[in-house]
């Protein structure tokens, strides 16, 4: 179907989230919370002591949506549309695993995930004025056993470097994911069933 008019702001630079919104026919305008000059609105993405992976990802997604409202208000002269934000993290034995800092960190993460199942948690939030609605998607991913050579070659592609858990389910990593239980789109970064529910709550049509 044709993409609808731009009814929401998307507070995310993720091309995967933009692609998924287009997939369900939702037009949107991109909000950049922090530009190339490192100017913008800060969001604390550091896990807090005692914070569960679910609480962490929900807190960060809400903070992104709230920051997006501020950016949108400044940019649009006070005329604001609903802001959609999301955040994804990996939980391995309830330990939060985010994006790798560098190739060495990506190696460590993939070695930890190798041959084991882990949980991918994505929170999606829509904020408008004083209203905030949230949904959380949890999926289980089983990773095949990865030898050091495969990990090294995969990291050399650059694909893991901006991904939670150091892999992209829709990319080359699909070759070593043996089983998924849950939301494929949620693992990509935007659970579409939950997103459609949120959009409907704000009377925004999709699909």
Give residue spans per PLM region.
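Active-site-adjacent loop/tail segments of enzyme domains
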Residues: 88-118, 143
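Anionic-ligand binding region
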Residues: 107-113, 123-134, 138-139
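Mobile beta-alpha loop/short-helix "lid" or hinge segments that flank ligand
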Residues: 27-40, 123-131, 162-174
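Acidic/polar active-site rim loop that often engages polyanionic ligands
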Residues: 40-46, 92, 130-137
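N-terminal polybasic phosphate/anion-binding patch
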Residues: 1-82, 95, 196, 200-207
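Short, active-site-adjacent cap segments at secondary-structure transitions
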Residues: 17, 89-92, 97, 127, ...
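Residue-level signal for inorganic ion chemistry
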Residues: 21, 61, 87, 106, ...
